[in-house]
Each structure stands twice: as C-alpha cells, then as structure tokens.
Amino acid sequence: MRSNHRISFYSLILVGVALFAMRYVQQKPADTLPMKITTWDALGYYMYLPATFIYKDLRELKFYPSIENKYQLQGEAGNFYQFMKTENGYYTGKYFIGVAILQMPFFLISHFLALSLGEADGFSQIYQAGIGYGAVLWVFLSLIYFRRFLLQYYDDLTVGIGLLLGILGTNIFQYISVDSAQSHAWIFPLYVYILILSDTWHREKTILKSILLGLTVGAATICRPTEAIIFVIPMLWNYQKGNFWRYWWENRILVLWSGLGFIAILSIQLFYWKYSTGQWVFDVGSKWHFLNPHFRVLFGEEKGWLIYTPLCWLMVWGLFLITDKKFSVSVKTFIFLNIWIVIAWAIWRYGGSYSARALSQSTPVMMLPMLAAIQFLIHSKYKILVYAAFTYFLSLNIFQIFQYNNGVLHADRNTWEYYRRIYWKTSATEEDKKYLQSDAEQ
C-alpha cells in the first residue's frame, strides 16, 4: 500500500466491514429459515441452480411444489410468476440465467457443505447464507480493483470519501447486504470490470482484453437484458470527434474478437430457451413506455431515486464536471440511456424496493461523476459545511435502510406527508399509516 493512498485503503476496509455487518444484522428471519433471501424475484434468478445440479429438472420443475410448501419462497401464494408454462408444456424462466451463473460458485460450495452439515435441498439455511454472504464477498473483491482504478483519476481523499458515499450512502447498500439474492449485487462488479477493461483496452489493445470485454458485456446482458447498453462504455471511451468510425474500423479485428466473446455468453441463454420452449428467442413479456417515461421513478413520492437517496444528486451534478476526462462522453451517454430505459419500464414501481433499485447495479459508472463533484466540494472554502452535509446524508441513508427493513419506510406506498411524518423516526403510528397510498392509488 502506498503511503499516500492510505485514506482510500482504510475507507475500503470500512466499507467492507459495513457490508458484511449489515448482512449479518439484517438476517430477515422467517418461520422456516433464519435467513430467507431467495424469494420473490430472487427465486427466479436462483432457481436454475438447484434445478440443474440437484434435481436434474430444469423445465418440468416437479420438485418445486414440495419446496414451496416447506419454505414459502415465491412470495404470492399460488402465483408462481417466476416461471411461465409455455405451449410445449414446459416451464421457462421469466428472469434470465446470468445471475445464476454468477452465483454458481457459492451455490456449489454451499451444496458441498450441505451434504455433510444440513439439508441438501438447494434452499435450506446453508444455501441462503452462501448466496447472501457470497454476494457481499463478490462485490467487495470488485471494490478492491475499483479503488485502484479510481485512483488513476482522482486523489486519495476523494476516492476514500467516494467509496463511503457511493456504496453506503446510496441504495446499492440495501441490495448488496440485505436483498443479496436479487440481481443488483451480482451485476455491480460487471460494471466495475467493464470500466477497468475499457480503460486498459484503450491503453493497450490485445485479443485477450477484447474477448474479456465481449464476455463482460455478454454476462451483463444475460443477467438483465437492459444491461446490454453497457457496451457503450468501451465503445465511447476516449471518444474523439471526427475520428470515431475510422478508429473502430482500424480495430475491426479486435471488435470481432469481442463479438465472439459476447456471442459465446449469450448462447447460454439461447440454448436454455431452445431447451425449455423449443424456440431460440422467447419473449418474457416486458412492456415499455419509451415515449412516455415515468419520471416519478426519479422524483416521485413513492420511492424517487433523487428524493430518498439524495446523495445521488452528486452523480447528476458531477456530469457537468467531467468534461476533461477521457470517459466523459462514454459515461454521460451510458447514464442518459440507462436512466431513460429504467424510467420507461411499464411497471415503474419495480415491486417492493428502496429507492430506484433498477439503477443501483450501475452505481460504479455513476460514481465517476459523483467523485468529480466530491473533489470539487471538498476543496472549496465551504469544506466544513460539505463534510457536515456528507455525514448527514450518509447517516440518513443508513437509517432509512433500517426503516425500510423494519416496515417503517414503505416499499412502494409512501406519500410526501407520510415521509415527513416518519422522517428520522424508528416507528410509524397508526395515524401516520393513514397517509400511505391506498390500494386504489397503486
């Protein structure tokens, strides 16, 4: 460790301790399991693993009714929405297979332990803990490399503060350490690696790096198909007007290598669809309102991203401060497209969630402008006020995460008046709850 990089190093350690501590504290106890996280949407991402490795039943799922009866994982009784029955009589997943692939090492370790120590049914406590703590470890390992990357562009103090605010001060904290089986924590490191690969590829182009870029884009795509726009990051990195098309034409062979890496990963999803539905491509039924997006995802009283996680305003402001960075066009283009896609989804509430969860996995990209804003502020003459504000909003985010997990901050029915009433409160009274949105307003 370089002596002049100690602040960001200790910040990284603090973030890691906080992530693991929150995972331990927020066990989400249930009647059937001390920790139960492969539920609701997370069940749809995870199901591929026990179905493949334990039950050898990836399309009939005959084993699942007994599992559901034992653990109650699907969320809504009688609504197995995570998998759809197709015309050929087989089930196919609503959610893509990529997250399960990323979870696989931790699942296999859990299964090995369960064979000796517990119930090896794929859903018992050992598996829940394996996925829960595995997600935290997966993210923390990526943060080690992310810190090194950030230090190429920002000073040590800025990176140290940025790691604290970007991870513990936004909603990604919830999805790494509490809702760990959801897709967000598993995709987060892919954004870290695409940033690092984009930067190193443009410095020194090799076939291996080209393939790794394609593999990373492919992995993100088969986790959540909307993550496919991650490709604009390497494509527009170090963008130079007037030289764009010629630059890529000169590197067309390496682009083909990236394409091969992408297709290799994408083919896993295609072969699964062919096996389960008889079709190479299957429509899972998502609907979009691209011409009439839902800006309340960002500003709404229910769970607005910039309302409930106000430190994210630094990510927005920082976009105006990165003009001189080689990643400026790349990051700005990605953030605009990503936000537009997220707010255009028809089911704009994204189920029960803290803030706008569909933006959380791309936090590494948004931290680049965020750190630009932090660097500007901490070197201003108002630094005392700046540090006070940072401390306040960081504390608020952590407090609200505890509110959310204890049912005080509602998952999708908040109103301005209700939020005012429970602000910094550890509980909500019956009078407070009268100000939640009614079922008719959902």
Identify what each model region corresponds to.
Residues 186-217, 234, 365-369:
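Specific aromatic-rich, kink-prone transmembrane helix
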Residues 29-38, 54-133, 174, 346, ...:
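Interfacial juxtamembrane loops and adjacent helix segments
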Residues 1, 6-16, 157, 256-263, ...:
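Signature aromatic-anchored transmembrane alpha helix within multi-pass, membrane-resident enzymes
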Residues 233, 237-238, 250-320, 331-342, ...:
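Membrane-lumen/periplasm interface segments of specific transmembrane helices
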Residues 115-122, 141-170, 189, 204-208, ...:
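Transmembrane-helix signature of polytopic, membrane-embedded enzymes
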Residues 49, 163-164, 208-224, 231-235, ...:
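Membrane-interface alpha helices of multi-pass inner-membrane proteins
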